[in-house]
């Protein structure tokens, strides 16, 4: 990154439109799920032999981490999401817009984080609805925001390997 300040058009902030699309799609899907599906296992919709739509509340983080706590975790995870969103937006402002890979990764994480924060602040929980399973083993239910966060993080990790390989050549 150069020392010269980038304009908004030149910087990765241009890619925040993707975060907005992810956020709007996430809350839109969650709205449909909350208003059209019954809550819980008995109301699941079997789609494929390994996939259900299932409306559940997650009071914790990934894998329902800390979901059994008294409620303080809601604000902890909200605070973490705000800090991460701020840092990633700052980094995007320093990255040239042409560095698509990292800007897309950051925008995906921001969109997902803001989608889940919206749920935490408005509802007190995150709405999850995707249930993948094999036999009797079910992966923890998740949502579009979770997928965006994970894919963005995977892109950042892959970029770290990609840059090392390029440096060796």
UniProtKB/Swiss-Prot annotation:
Xref: PROSITE patterns: SPASE_II
GO annotation, cellular component aspect: plasma membrane
Highest taxon, organism lineage: Bacteria
Protein name: Lipoprotein signal peptidase
GO molecular function ontology, one term from the record: aspartic-type endopeptidase activity
Function text: This protein specifically catalyzes the removal of signal peptides from prolipoproteins.
Active site (UniProt): 128, 146
Membrane topology: Multi-pass membrane protein
Catalytic reaction(s) noted: Release of signal peptides from bacterial membrane prolipoproteins. Hydrolyzes -Xaa-Yaa-Zaa-|-(S,diacylglyceryl)Cys-, in which Xaa is hydrophobic (preferably Leu), and Yaa (Ala or Ser) and Zaa (Gly or Ala) have small, neutral side chains
Record carries keyword Ribosomal protein: no
Subcellular location: Cell inner membrane
Pfam families from the UniProt entry: Peptidase_A8
Annotated metabolic or biological route of this protein: Protein modification; lipoprotein biosynthesis (signal peptide cleavage)
Gene, per the UniProt record: lspA
Family per record: Belongs to the peptidase A8 family.
GO biological process, one term: proteolysis
HAMAP family (alphabetical): LspA
